[in-house]
Swiss-Prot record:
SUPFAM superfamilies: Glutathione synthetase ATP-binding domain-like, Succinyl-CoA synthetase domains. GO terms for biological process: succinyl-CoA metabolic process; tricarboxylic acid cycle. The gene is sucC. GO terms for cellular component: succinate-CoA ligase complex. This is Succinate--CoA ligase [ADP-forming] subunit beta. Signal peptide: none annotated. Succinyl-CoA synthetase functions in the citric acid cycle (TCA), coupling the hydrolysis of succinyl-CoA to the synthesis of either ATP or GTP and thus represents the only step of substrate-level phosphorylation in the TCA. The beta subunit provides nucleotide specificity of the enzyme and binds the substrate succinate, while the binding sites for coenzyme A and phosphate are found in the alpha subunit.
Length: 387
């Protein structure tokens, strides 16, 4: 799950990580009130969307007067903003964050993530903040420091100090960085996060470190035990179809093709998309209906797939292990009738009671195209969209 900047900063503050004072606003007048409550300025007005790169898109403004605050907020709120990090999607700006604007002397980069290669929580730090870390890694990799944390010992204060010395910080800042890193480690573990990014982690004119911008991602599989994080979810920033899928316990990801996929099991779903690609087609989605492919779940799955007008055919690829193929076939038939599917439907069944399932499909009176195996089904799906 993604979070807004203001939500990330709320969590930072709870764990003692220094952040500029700030308030959110949903209107230009509220933004002015927020600015006045923070002092005499200057201020930063920042659009709150689930994407980075807001500055280049006009979503971050430096304001010296409350009139400028009002103008900046009015220009952002109620609009949709696309950035180079939003994957071509324009996201709605429903809130702005108004913060104090400190005088920056140096920008650093600091992140915490799970490194699958080393199977550890890993810190990435750089003396080059305020820019994409990927660019730094490509152009000046010597400016990046990494630290893999031993999961038994945990992060030790000396490790944070060592990173600080390598970044060229002064003694006071080295100690501040060590404390920030320890706080981030605790936050990361307490909340089951998958990413924390401070970019920039800035040195202000008084010599202190502050997290001027922050990004947090949490592990969706752990959300059930963090109701306080679940309450922060902003569905307006998400794909509507994916939101509906999650509400029905379906794993759905929108893609760019025209062949809808309905599969039980994530591994089989990925294999199905691969075989479609190998046969010259393009999948329109990833959709795992799970082990219990009931009529209700299959019906919802068809509705999700057909919510995209790009879909020209649907490939249903089901392996009946625990669930019998005849029960799955009944669910498919009922769902096709209820939804009123107008595009070709190719069905491949395999597993328990497969013959009974195929017989039900064959005698259903519906224009369902049977497939013998995954490759046959993919070929027929590709043929259906290229007619």
């Amino acid at each position: 799950m993604n979070f807004h900047e203001y939500q990330a900063k709320q969590l930072f503050a709870e764990y003692g990580i220094p952040v500029p004072a700030g308030r959110i606003a949903s209107s230009a007048d509220e933004a002015v009130t927020a600015a006045k409550s923070l002092g005499n300025g200057p201020w930063m007005v920042k659009a709150q969307i689930h994407a980075g790169g807001r500055g280049k898109a006009g979503g971050v403004k430096f304001c010296k007067t409350t009139d400028e605050v009002k103008q900046a907020a009015a220009a952002m709120l109620g609009t949709k903003m696309a950035t180079y990090q939003s994957a071509g999607v324009a996201l709605p700006v429903n809130l702005v964050l108004v913060t104090e604007a400190g005088e920056i002397t140096k920008e650093l980069y600091l992140s915490v993530l799970v490194d699958r290669g080393t199977r550890s929580i890993t810190y990435i730090a750089s003396s080059e903040g305020g820019v994409d870390i990927e660019h730094v890694a490509a152009e000046t990799p010597e400016k990046i420091q990494t630290l893999n944390v031993d999961f038994v010992e945990g992060l030790q204060p000396y490790q944070g100090r060592d990173i600080g010395f390598h970044l060229g910080l002064e003694a006071k800042q080295v100690n501040q960085l060590s404390k920030i890193m320890i706080s981030l480690y605790q936050l990361f573990n307490d909340k089951d996060l998958s990413l924390i990014e401070l970019n920039p982690l800035a040195i202000l004119s008084n010599g202190d470190l502050y997290a001027l911008d922050g990004k947090i991602n949490s592990d969706d599989n752990a959300t059930f035990r963090h109701k306080e994080l679940a309450a922060m979810r902003d569905k307006t920033q998400e794909d509507e179809t994916e939101v509906l899928a999650s509400e029905n316990d379906l794993n759905y990801v929108t893609m760019d093709g025209n062949i809808g996929c309905m599969v039980n099991g994530a591994g089989l779903a990925m294999a199905t998309m691969d075989v479609i690609k190998l046969n010259g087609g393009e999948p329109a989605n990833f959709l795992d209906v799970g082990g219990g492919a009931t009529k209700e779940r299959v019906t919802t799955a068809f509705k999700l797939i057909l919510s995209s007008n790009k879909v020209k055919a649907i490939f249903v690829n089901i392996f009946g292990g625990i669930v019998r193929c005849d029960m799955i076939a009944e669910g498919i038939i009922a769902a096709v009738k209820e939804v009123g599917v107008k595009v070709p439907v190719i069905v491949r069944l395999e597993g328990t009671n497969v013959d009974a399932g195929k017989q039900l499909l064959a005698t259903s009176g519906l224009a369902i195209i049977p497939a013998d195996d995954i490759n046959d089904g993919a070929k027929k799906a590709v043929a259906a969209v290229t007619v």
